[in-house]
Swiss-Prot record:
Disulfide bonds: none
UniProt lineage: Eukaryota, Metazoa, Ecdysozoa, Arthropoda, Hexapoda
Matches recorded under PANTHER family: ATP SYNTHASE, ATP SYNTHASE SUBUNIT BETA, MITOCHONDRIAL
Keyword line: ATP synthesis, ATP-binding, CF(1), Hydrogen ion transport, Ion transport, Membrane, Mitochondrion, Mitochondrion inner membrane, Nucleotide-binding, Translocase, Transport
Gene Ontology CC: mitochondrial inner membrane; proton-transporting ATP synthase complex
Protein name as it appears in the record: ATP synthase subunit beta, mitochondrial
InterPro entries registered for this protein in UniProt: ATPase_alpha/beta_chains (IPR050053), ATPase_F1/V1/A1_a/bsu_nucl-bd (IPR000194), P-loop_NTPase (IPR027417)
Example GO molecular function: ATP binding
EC number: 7.1.2.2
Class of this enzyme: translocase
């Protein structure tokens, strides 16, 4: 409900665009969000007034595909900002799954993991992505990122 409210306000009240990047989403969740957006009028199937882009990498996809979803969503947001001159709200759900997918790719490439099992390039990967979320003279990107906490245990190093 909160996501829908924010997307609706950005699109209708402020005239901006929204990009939703679903990293490791369940098919049902992505489908539900899509249909909720149609029902609320955020996505219009009748004309070109929609101001939302949805990018998904399902949880059953290979880690390389899941790792690229957040970056693809960010690239779409950069296009809206730089080419269309729009302010953009970027949702990334879930940033932990982005990190997890990167860790899986790193393991497949034979890289030695860090002390808690993450890829040795985690700080660079995350920093590079976060630094692209910025304001320019043409528009801005504001990001809201959901974080999944494994087993709801904040002390879990995963």
């Amino acid at each position: 409900v909160l996501i829908m409210e924010l997307i609706n306000n950005v699109a209708k009240a402020h005239g901006g665009y929204t990009v939703f990047a679903g990293v490791g989403e369940r098919t049902r969740e992505g489908n539900d969000l899509y249909h909720e957006m149609i029902e609320s009028g955020v996505i219009s199937l009748k004309d070109k007034t929609s101001k939302v882009a949805l990018v998904y990498g399902q949880m059953n996809e290979p880690p390389g595909a899941r790792a690229r979803v957040a970056l693809t969503g960010l690239t779409v947001a950069e296009y809206f900002r730089d080419q269309e001159g729009q302010d953009v709200l970027l949702f990334i759900d879930n940033i932990f799954r982005f990190t997890q997918a990167g860790s899986e790719v790193s393991a497949l490439l034979g890289r030695i993991p860090s002390a808690v099992g993450y890829q040795p390039t985690l700080a660079t990967d995350m920093g590079t992505m976060q630094e692209r979320i910025t304001t320019t003279s043409k528009g801005s990107i504001t990001s809201v990122q959901a974080i999944y906490v494994p087993a709801d245990d904040l002390t879990d190093p995963a």
